[in-house]
Amino acid sequence: MVVAVEYISKEESSDVAEGAASVQHGVTGILAVQGAFAEHAAMLDRLGAPWKLLRAAEDFDDSIDRVILPGGESTTQGKLLRSTGLFEPIAEHIAAGKPVFGTCAGMILLAGRLDNDENVYFGALDAVVRRNAYGRQLGSFVATADFGSATGDFAVSVAPGERVPESAASESIVLKDFPLVFIRGPFVAEVGEQATVETSVNGNVVGLRQGNVLATAFHPELTDDTRIHELFLSL
């Protein structure tokens, strides 16, 4: 079971080592105090990318070169980030310009401001986010949209089932027809000049990128589509 695995490396798992050998990056730290961290780990397993669950400050070591903030309950996660001592090392990671990916609650944690909550966490995005914008659990839904801000003749389209090129970070990439799973998700109420809109649904912005910060209001980890995780690993 994925949830039982704390860390996968070349030394500890020869099965994963073959897939991980071609991945040109270190370990992805997945915040694991609450929420859908196991699903993100399963996605990285499929891509042969090593990961480590972050439950306490001592889990955040020099091997980690990128961080995932999973979906869940943002207020609870915010409190646990402080009590576990993980807030400071993750904040330093973000301030250093290293890659971070937030989904749903993770987008809230990365927001520069919330328009319906006085809390501010990492403040990494030049954007105002609205918590629980899509209402209660019964308001959850699935949509399909292209993901990526690239337009014109130089945009590289990646269709469902295709792999994102390893050079994606330096190319104009559009992920075609990506499945968007919303569970009481937020959306972006205001987008500042530094952030780039990656996708929208019904006029609401639900995907942003700002440098090495990637954030979605939806849950790509709850689908069978690995393309956004591939894009994140290319940052």
Predicted regions and their residues:
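C-terminal and late-domain segments of enzyme folds
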Residues: 2-19, 140, 153, 160-179, ...
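Hydrophobic anchor at the start of a short beta-strand
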Residues: 51-52, 100, 213
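Cysteine-nucleophile active-site neighborhood
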Residues: 73-152
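N-terminal beta1-alpha1 cap of cysteine-dependent amidohydrolase-like domains
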Residues: 1-83, 88-92, 151, 158-166, ...
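A secondary-structure boundary/capping signal
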Residues: 32-33, 103-105, 125, 184, ...
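Redox-cofactor binding/interface segments in oxidoreductases and associated redox assembly factors
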Residues: 68-69, 102, 216
